Amino acid sequence: MDFLKEIVKEIGDDFTKVAQDIDETERFIDTGSHIFNAVVSGSIYGGVSSNKITAIAGESSTGKTYFSLAVVKNFLDTNPDGYCLYFDTEAAVNRGLLESRGVDLDRLVVINVVTIEEFRSKALRAVDKYMQMPIEDRKPCMFVLDSLGMLSTEKEIRDALDDKQVRDMTKSQLVKGAFRMLTLKLGQANVPLIVTNHTYDVIGAYVPTKEMGGGSGLKYAASTIIYLGRKKEKDGKEVVGNIIKAKTAKSRISKENKQVEIRLFFDDRGLDRYYGLLELGEIGGIWKNVAGRYEINGKKIYAKQILANPEEYFTPEVMQALDEIAQKEFSYGS
């Protein structure tokens, strides 16, 4: 043990420790949806990891940007002194959109990036600047990249300007290099990174398979990869949001290949915190679904009525029971 301590002392690195001294507490950032918290962390009170990369992938119009902004809003609401750096590659985020989502404009920086090299450079500089601050002065911070699939490369731009009709074979390696540099630095700084990305159907696969674009760099760097699908949510004839199907394609924290449904409103309500808990309670046997109504305390109540007044039905005792069910359903080793 003395030898190991001498090695640690000789290296003189703040991030080199004897294993016994490592802080094993996993910290999470609440996403604003209990059921999404459960599928990515194994607890309805968890969320995305506070110092790892989380990838949110899906086809066009599955709500990746809306979903990311909903998580950002909840992060800023939960951390009144926190802030977020939003790397926008699609010029999709403007003041009107942010205001409609209820995001605090004073604590969000939108950074437009065109190339992988530009994102890598700006993100690394931001992390280094953050880590130069004394630990006690560091406020909670989150990074978002929306989206990886739209990033070009400097070579691709040069070839286009020179009218060269050639395919850029460097993009995959540049993505890998960017995440090799960022993954550990973000972990050391306790800064989470949410990356949105597009998916495509794998041609020739024996079973229908989807894969993320941009090569394997993000696939290896991300601790959690969530694939999204969606259907429209209507109030009468008006479309008021999406029902998002979220499936864990990869997770180092919770079980893989688990799927849940989340409700995302288009207005400033964002993610519905309680949507999906009725189905979770049904799995755990807390209540039964009989002809579209749930039996709770001897009464048969429609889901719409319960979700309209969640505090009445999701009491602290019920939430504790639901969390235990979530741990059994989604956590490793259960």
Regions found by a protein language model. Give the residues of each.
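Catalytic P-loop NTPase motifs of RecA-like helicase/translocase cores
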Residues: 93, 151-152, 202-203
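Phosphate-binding/switch region of NTP-binding enzymes
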Residues: 168-284
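Short acidic-hydrophobic, aromatic-tinged amphipathic segments that line or gate anion-handling sites
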Residues: 108-114
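Phosphate-binding/switch loop-helix module in NTP-utilizing enzymes
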Residues: 114-190
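A short alpha->loop->secondary-structure connector
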Residues: 101-108, 159-168, 210-215
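Peripheral, non-AAA+ core regions of ATP-driven protein-machinery
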Residues: 18-24, 35, 164, 241-242, ...
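The Walker A/P-loop phosphate-binding site
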Residues: 1-107, 119-128
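Terminal-proximal interaction/regulatory segments of ATP-powered molecular machines
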Residues: 289-334
